[in-house]
């Protein structure tokens, strides 16, 4: 989570230079992993018109496959993510955006990444607090995979 910038940047997350540097880092990591046959998950802030999102970028063979946005932001104890970040609302549809030199990148929570060579392998992502709520994004992922991936027998 937020491995590009670090989790404790506080109000520096509002600085455009930090946001641009994080986006450029994704582009550079994509270029450097072009020959790597592994999914790479990278945490970073993503600035959009409506706010800044705590996200995970997913890379494979030099391509940005998706940007997962965190929905549930902790605001207790030492956590105050709602000060800097906007939650991606459950009722928001997946958007397709341009980011880090890539076009039509899925941005949201309800994103499934399917292996082109093995349709029985499907991956999704959720970030930290999203896992610990009563109905996490992964519950929707599992339901969708069950509906989409049921083998014909």
What are these regions (language model features)?
Residues 1-153:
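Enzyme catalytic cores with a strong preference for nitrogen-chemistry domains
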